[in-house]
């Protein structure tokens, strides 16, 4: 059965939850979020900065087919290897405000794991604005790439 990223957005709330199961050990899934070369490959973005540690920060840049550059960045507030990352996220060219993201990495079996994310937005309007974009489709495609890329590292 094909794995699919699930997004739950309750009406009137300024948060959403994201879950995805992977056929990967939890250590490898965690590595996909903290090693710059792997992040670049599955996210399709350039990593300008990635300090994978408590009080670290990150900045990524994506260029669209027309040459427009989009940057997003944040600060890492909590970092526990193979368990969780708490960070902020800001899309610098958009007016979606700063998000707070809680990423939890859960071992399901010896070779499978699950990513559980909770994202809190400044307002319901900001969350709903993001959901109007091809957010869910893009995230599912990125998670499919993550699985494919990391299959080669197993």
What are these regions (language model features)?
Residues 13-19, 57, 71, 84, ...:
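Intrinsic-disorder/low-complexity, polar/charged segments enriched in Ser/Thr/Lys/Arg/Asp/Glu/Gln
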Residues 151-154:
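Short, highly charged C-terminal tails/helix-capping segments
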Residues 26, 77-83, 104-114:
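A short, structured loop/turn motif at beta-sheet edges
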Residues 17-18, 36-69, 82:
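Short beta-edge strand/loop motif at the mouth of beta-sheet-based domains
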Residues 1-46:
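Hydrophobic ligand-binding cavity/cleft-lining segments
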Residues 20, 48, 72-78, 89, ...:
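Hydrophobic/aromatic beta-strand elements that line small-molecule binding cavities or substrate pockets
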Residues 92-137:
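Beta-strand/loop substructures that line and gate deep hydrophobic ligand-binding cavities in soluble
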Residues 29-30, 39, 58-60, 76, ...:
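Hydrophobic pocket/interface hotspot
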């Amino acid at each position: 059965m094909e794995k699919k990223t699930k997004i739950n957005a309750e009406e009137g709330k300024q948060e959403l939850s994201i879950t995805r199961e992977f056929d990967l050990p939890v250590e490898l899934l965690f590595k996909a979020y903290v090693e710059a070369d792997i992040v670049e490959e599955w996210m399709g973005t350039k990593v300008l900065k990635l300090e994978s540690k408590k009080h670290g920060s990150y900045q990524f840049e994506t260029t669209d087919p027309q040459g427009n550059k989009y940057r997003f960045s944040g600060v890492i507030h909590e970092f526990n290897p193979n368990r969780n990352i708490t960070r902020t996220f800001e899309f610098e060219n958009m007016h979606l405000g700063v998000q707070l993201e809680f990423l939890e990495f859960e071992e399901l079996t010896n070779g499978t794991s699950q990513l559980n994310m909770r994202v809190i937005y400044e307002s319901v309007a900001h969350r709903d604005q993001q959901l109007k974009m091809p957010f869910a489709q893009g995230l599912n495609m990125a998670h499919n790439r993550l699985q494919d890329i990391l299959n080669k590292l197993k």
